[in-house]
Amino acid sequence: MRLILLTLAAVMSAAPALAADPVKLQATLAGSAESDADGTGSATVTIDPAKSEVCYTLKVSGIEPATMAHIHKGAAGVSGPVVVPLDAPTSGTAQGCKPAAAEVIAAIVASPADYYVNVHNATFPKGAIRGQLSR
């Protein structure tokens, strides 16, 4: 019994540290998922709960120049609100880190498929290419 309690205590004390590890997500961006059939791209997103930070690299083609980029809440085929603004990949590539609320970070980590990366341009101001986040 004592061994079980000690093991349980060790696991419980390690859980917060494990939960704070950065989580790497990806998305394949396609115009067919939004509105510009010629646009393509990729997104690599690293969520760091310990820093309340979302770091990203966006690479796009066929939509230049991009005017905005965001992470939105929304399942595939569903439009949703912006939860993390990103820098637009105006020359085809953008990378950086943005702060995000702990609740947003926890929700994205818990269910990445309920969030998508959307890149906009002047022709398609509501979104040119889009891709759902996945592990």
Where are these regions (language model features)?
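Metal-centered catalytic cores of metalloenzymes
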Residues: L18-A69, K73-R135
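N-terminal signal peptide c-region/cleavage motif recognized by signal peptidases
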Residues: A14-P16
